[in-house]
């Protein structure tokens, strides 16, 4: 499989940094949450790809609903706008991530917009179901979904599981297994290890991770660092945190 064909596999909507998958939580009403990946290095069969930046914007529309917009800028070697999309995310059942008992359940869906890459000028669609809960001492987020890709309207299926382990007051070790497959393509599966650190009491989180491909269609290695921050456009508020 060539590096170009790897790009046809979809990148998930509204991912929760530094993961490919996401959690069953949304921004509070009138709160803007910014997920910025300011450096990403991907190595596939001795070819390096730099992505800087990647940007996800989450805006709380009203209680338990948010709008999500995202895109990436890729240099390999030309500059391209990749993986643009607009999505709606809704919490169907309040639970751990909303400060209530039980699991949190959410759904996210929306169009995959055209990119500047060759062959990706169409419009696709993606929908994901999300469940978040606790398997002590871990917080776990499970995702599954699918859709139609933007390149040639082929169906795809995606899945992922995130685990988070608090090791200090403002530090979490994190891991993820995730994958995806598209009709006529090999599975793209990978594993992640990293950390999320909150350096102050403000709503700012720094992250770093390394990802290793565990199937032939996945990139060999990926390294990234990024930051997530949020602020209210009305009054200050914070997302419930389960630790």
Sequence positions of predicted segments:
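Bacterial N-terminal signal peptides that target proteins for export
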Residues: 1-2
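Short stretches within intrinsically disordered, low-complexity N-terminal or propeptide regions
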Residues: 5-6, 92
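N-terminal signal peptide c-region/cleavage motif recognized by signal peptidases
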Residues: 8-10
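Transmembrane beta-barrel domains of Gram-negative outer membranes and organellar outer membranes
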Residues: 13-243
